[in-house]
Regions:
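Terminal amphipathic alpha-helical/low-complexity segments used for targeting or macromolecular assembly
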Residues: 1-173, 296-308
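Structural signal for interior beta-strand "rungs" in well-ordered beta-sheet cores
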Residues: 175-290, 294
Length: 308
């Protein structure tokens, strides 16, 4: 026996032994998990329904919108229903019950699509009103990562409220990887919501955000660290942000009892774990800057550019 074959056989034996001990590796009763690729394609294809003139490759979208939308929705409806059914089957539901469950949820989801579109239009308006660098709403739809992350969140949140396993989180983590913006599908977010720049924004599962809220890059709406883990699964762990609040870059607002009152501005680089009253401006004390005069060429003999 060659060394290569020996190593492979030993690895196979150890791996399969672990598979037998931990059902996690092979799934529950060998049931399929939802297809991640199908769900990502669903996200992409739904954009051609919400904004048909932008993401549709079919020219009929603008000429015969009724026919185009009916045709595309039929396919998307079947795709989502199938993936939801697979998710419930994996969770142990009986086949007929999972099928009926998926049918009802899919019906409610697509009945809610016009409302999702309405909410996104308010988010779009918030982005345009709040960013003087935006040349047009079209630019925001096409290119802003914050708007894309919000779009995916609004789809995923509807399924989260229906207690659909796996799919809402697959959606949100796809958006997270694509944009660098992490919005848990369980968060509750009002209309006219805007994330400017966006990289590094984190919004936790039990966060509540009111109307007309604006976040900048690096903002965390998170939980205080705890060792209780799963014991807090259904407990409010993340802050509440009231209407008309702006939170500037790299600020952290933490804790389930923390409430930021309406019409409040949170300055950058702040760390907040207690409630802030309405109509307030919060800022961190600026660090002292040390400014030195430039040295002459004769003096610059040190190897390093930085010197105390």
């Amino acid at each position: 026996m060659t060394e290569k074959k020996k190593i492979i056989l030993e690895a196979v034996e150890k791996l399969t032994d672990t598979y037998r001990k931990e059902e996690l590796f092979l799934g529950k009763d060998r049931e399929r998990l939802p297809n991640k690729k199908e769900i990502i394609n669903f996200i992409k294809d739904m954009r051609s329904i919400i904004f048909p003139g932008y993401f549709s490759v079919d020219s009929s979208a603008s000429v015969f919108p009724e026919h185009y939308v009916a045709y595309r929705l039929n396919d998307l409806y079947d795709c989502l229903q199938e993936q939801i059914e697979i998710a419930f089957l994996y969770q142990g539901e009986e086949e007929q019950k999972a099928k009926e469950h998926a049918e009802r949820i899919t019906e409610r989801f697509f009945a809610n699509v016009p409302e999702i579109q309405r909410m996104l239009l308010t988010d779009l308006q918030a982005g345009f009103d709040g960013d003087p660098a935006a040349k047009s709403k079209e630019e925001i739809i096409f290119s802003y990562p914050g708007f894309y992350a919000i779009y995916v969140y609004r789809l995923a949140h509807v399924l989260y409220l229906e207690n659909v396993p796996f799919i809402p989180r697959i959606m949100s983590e796809y958006a997270h990887g694509y944009t660098g913006i992490d919005i848990n599908p369980g968060a509750t977010i009002g209309e006219y919501f805007f994330i400017d720049h966006g990289t590094g924004v984190v919004i936790g599962e039990t966060t509540e955000i009111g109307r007309n809220v604006k976040l900048y890059q690096g903002v965390t709406l998170g939980a205080l660290s705890t060792r209780q883990g799963q014991l807090l699964a259904n407990v409010k762990r993340h802050p509440t942000i009231r209407d008309n609040v702006t939170i500037y870059s790299n600020s952290s607002v933490l804790g389930g009892e923390t409430v930021i009152g309406e019409n409040t501005i949170i300055g950058g680089n702040t760390f907040i774990t207690a409630s802030i009253p309405a109509n307030t401006k919060v800022s961190a004390k600026s660090p002292e800057l040390v400014i030195k005069k430039p040295r002459s060429a004769v003096e610059t003999t040190n190897v390093w550019d930085w010197e105390n």
